[in-house]
Regions:
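Short beta->alpha linker loops
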Residues: 19, 46-47, 71, 85-89, ...
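Helix-loop "lid/cap" segments that line or gate small-molecule binding pockets
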Residues: 27-28, 47-61, 118, 151
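Metal-dependent phosphoesterase signature
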Residues: 55-94, 100
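Short, surface-exposed acidic
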Residues: 33-41, 61-70, 158
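An amphipathic alpha-helix signature
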Residues: 21, 25, 48-53, 65, ...
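Active-site neighborhood of HAD-like aspartate-dependent phosphohydrolases
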Residues: 1-42
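Asp-based, Mg2+/Mn2+-dependent phosphohydrolase catalytic module
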Residues: 1-3, 95-98, 111-219
Length: 219
């Protein structure tokens, strides 16, 4: 029986992936380097150090990474100050989860300060039973460590957890951890080899009917 819903954050709860992409591409252009959308897709759901390693390899180390990082982060913060919206269906889904008495966890590759900033305008963060950020793990997605840590800290088994993700890296982490997984794609579609093991939906509102297929209905 389903006991917990484990949420990714960027691109799933918040519409942040597009401004991450703009920031990474802006910082590349500042050094005369073009980061295409196809190149950026490799970074979705992956922690920054690994993304930067891929980027350095892609440009054969012809990039000043210290300068790049500073420009990228400054541009991201500038864009983020304009406001970040919740993704379609999150409000209703979160309410439905709480009505069913299910446990919730936030499991993100982002750092804790970014989590606090994103949730500041909304009354949701303190409603999560567990929060796992980049600071808590040694290995980023697609490694399963974050989701293994989540269900263990919650005192549950992997099969009692449903992971919601927008990225292939996150889905791979969830499946490797032994959890059920639903993908709500944001900037890229699910990889073909994953399709038989997951459910793919258009938005978070569509997750609500699945809750009753895994566990007790709301009363």
């Amino acid at each position: 029986m389903l006991k917990a819903i484990l949420f990714d954050m960027d691109g799933l709860i918040f519409d942040t992936e597009s401004i991450y992409r703009q920031s990474w591409q802006f910082a590349g252009a500042e050094q005369g380097l073009q980061i295409t959308d196809d190149t950026y897709q490799q970074f979705i759901g992956v922690q920054d150090p690994e993304c930067e390693r891929i980027l350095a390899e892609h440009f054969q180390n012809a990039i000043d990474m210290t300068r790049y990082r500073a420009v990228r982060d400054a541009h991201f913060h500038q864009l983020r100050e304009q406001g970040i919206g919740l993704k379609t269906g999150f409000d209703g889904l979160f309410s439905a989860i709480k009505l069913r008495g299910l446990t919730t966890a936030l499991v993100t590759s982002s750092h804790r300060p970014d989590v606090l900033y994103n949730f500041a305008p909304f009354n949701y963060l303190d409603q999560f039973d567990l929060i796992i950020t980049a600071e808590d793990v040694q290995h980023g997605k697609p490694h399963p460590e974050c989701y293994q840590m989540a269900y263990r800290k919650l005192g549950l088994k992997s099969q009692q957890c449903l992971v919601l993700e927008d990225s292939n890296s996150g889905i791979k982490a969830a499946l490797a951890a032994g959890c059920h997984a639903v993908m709500i794609p944001d900037l890229l579609p699910p990889q073909t080899e994953l399709m038989s093991d997951i459910t793919v939906l258009d938005n978070l509102a569509q997750v609500i009917p699945l809750l009753d297929s895994y566990g007790p209905k709301a009363t």
